[in-house]
């Protein structure tokens, strides 16, 4: 006898007549007049629960089985049989039910209701994985994570663990969480009256990272092809469906590569991930197509068969100006494209994923390679129908004199980036990479529009519960 997952039963890994044991939680119990009960038990391995047909001759039928309610945990043993009902091929003829844990008060159990709003579930983040939607999101998120690691491993990339604590601001935006052990009631001061961070734990101002990119570049300039995949932090006071204070980023960096190479890598990676989720999590995608976004599957299938359109930022501005769309934000050369502009390009103009390249330097970071026109940098955004920007990347500035000039323009200290400048002094090399906001990817795949619902415990302004 073996303990097995519900998913493996539905895959047909066990022949009819096999004795199995399933461990999980009760989704529902239904009693028949014939003296049997039907337990729907799920273990999180797949979307559907398995049905256990429980006879009333079990020892604990009256005093335990008939007390089972949604959320109770059980160990259910029995025989695999063909299911006469529609919806699943197999069920269990149960010979033993062990109750691991009861729900104290079924009437007040928060997950007992048939359906909660997804907004309400955020207040119950410790229990929401028990719902169909958040369980499905978790499995899709896992599938995408595994696909990303597989993709880069198969391509010969090395995974680099970049630090979460840093003294560098990758974006130059200043919206960073400070890390300090100083006594806030008794801050040490310099002669000028400013906080003396020399007395702090790291001996200088330190922050939670906004990106692993700069650190990844150091390894790319020695190991050729690397990537990071980990949490990043932004102290933006933004309460929108697209922003989190803590989120995960995928950031590849490639030596001897240019912007076109980065664009091709982004396309290959996205298509690989979407193919994986279409193959491996079809049951969850069917749920999302039924309950959340009816085009969820169709959208992914179209994506993996589409050629990415490519366009310069300047040409994109002209397209936006020429269209008869009434945008909320005015369109002119030099603006950072807003979501409405991005979605028009991807959904209405090109009707396909699109890579917008060569943005004005004044709206991009210091490390992006300055183009020959002196006005634009070799930056790109990948725009996807249905969401807009999903990836941002660039060829990095490998020329020390140009990098120093850009640092000066943005009033950033060469001293703070001395190690980053060293890469340009000792065997500099053209290199490129990009960043993918992982939660936006999960949101795109599932159709769940608020990224607070695609990360287990969302962190946002005034919200750090659990």
From Swiss-Prot:
- Single GO biological process annotation from the record: asparaginyl-tRNA aminoacylation
The record's section on Pfam families has:
tRNA-synt_2, tRNA_anti-codon
* Keywords, in A-Z order: Aminoacyl-tRNA synthetase, ATP-binding, Cytoplasm, Ligase, Nucleotide-binding, Protein biosynthesis
Question: What HAMAP family does the entry give?
Answer: Asn_tRNA_synth
What's the Enzyme Commission number for this chain?
A: 6.1.1.22
Whether Nucleotide-binding counts among this entry's keywords is yes
Say if the entry is tagged with keyword Ribonucleoprotein.
Answer: no
The subunit structure is: Homodimer.
> Would you tell me the protein name for this molecule?
Asparagine--tRNA ligase
Organism lineage string? Bacteria, Pseudomonadati, Pseudomonadota, Gammaproteobacteria, Alteromonadales
Task: Give one GO term, molecular function aspect.
Answer: asparagine-tRNA ligase activity
Q: What class of enzyme is it?
A: ligase
Chemical reaction(s) catalysed: tRNA(Asn) + L-asparagine + ATP = L-asparaginyl-tRNA(Asn) + AMP + diphosphate + H(+)
């Amino acid at each position: 006898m073996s303990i097995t997952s519900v998913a493996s039963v539905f895959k047909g890994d066990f022949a009819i007549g096999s004795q199995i044991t399933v461990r999980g939680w009760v989704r529902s119990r239904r009693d028949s007049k014939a003296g049997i009960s039907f337990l729907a038990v799920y273990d999180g391995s797949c979307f559907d629960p398995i049905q256990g047909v429980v006879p009333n001759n079990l020892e604990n039928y009256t005093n335990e089985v008939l007390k089972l309610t949604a959320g109770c945990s059980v160990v259910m043993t029995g025989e695999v049989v063909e299911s006469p009902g529609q919806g699943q091929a197999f069920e269990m003829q149960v010979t033993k039910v062990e109750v691991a844990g009861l729900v104290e008060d079924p009437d007040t159990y928060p997950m007992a209701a048939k359906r909660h709003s997804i907004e309400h579930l955020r207040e119950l983040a410790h229990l929401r994985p028990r719902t169909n939607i958040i369980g499905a999101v978790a499995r899709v998120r896992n599938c995408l994570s595994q696909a990303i690691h597989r993709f880069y491993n198969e391509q010969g990339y090395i995974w680099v663990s970049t630090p979460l604590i840093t003294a560098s601001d990758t974006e130059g935006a200043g919206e960073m969480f400070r890390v300090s052990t100083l006594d806030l009631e008794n801050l040490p001061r310099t002669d000028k009256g400013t906080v003396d961070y020399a007395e702090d734990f790291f001996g200088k101002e330190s922050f939670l990272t906004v990106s692993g990119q700069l650190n990844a570049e150091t390894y790319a300039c020695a190991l050729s092809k690397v990537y990071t995949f980990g949490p990043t932090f932004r102290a933006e006071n933004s309460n929108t469906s697209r922003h989190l204070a803590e989120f995960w980023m995928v950031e590849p960096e490639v030596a001897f590569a240019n912007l076109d190479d980065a664009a091709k890598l982004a396309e290959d990676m996205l298509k690989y991930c979407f193919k994986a989720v279409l193959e491996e999590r079809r049951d969850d995608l069917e749920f999302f197509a039924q309950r959340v976004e009816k085009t969820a599957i169709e959208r992914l299938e179209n994506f993996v068969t589409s050629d990415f359109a490519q366009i310069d930022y300047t040409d994109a501005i002209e397209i936006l100006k020429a269209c008869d769309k009434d945008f909320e934000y005015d369109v002119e050369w030099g603006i950072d494209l807003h979501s409405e502009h991005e979605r028009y390009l991807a959904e209405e103009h090109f009707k396909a994923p699109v890579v917008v390249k060569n943005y004005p330097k004044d709206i991009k970071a210091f490390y992006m390679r300055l183009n020959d026109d002196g006005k634009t940098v070799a930056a790109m955004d990948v725009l996807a129908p249905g969401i807009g920007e999903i990836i941002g990347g660039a060829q990095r500035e490998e020329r020390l004199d140009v990098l120093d000039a850009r640092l000066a323009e943005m009033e950033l200290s060469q001293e703070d980036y001395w190690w980053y400048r060293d890469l340009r002094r000792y065997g500099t090399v053209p290199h490129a990479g990009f960043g993918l906001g992982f939660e936006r990817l999960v949101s795109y795949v599932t159709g769940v529009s608020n990224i607070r619902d695609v990360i287990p415990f969302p962190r946002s302004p005034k919200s750090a519960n659990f």
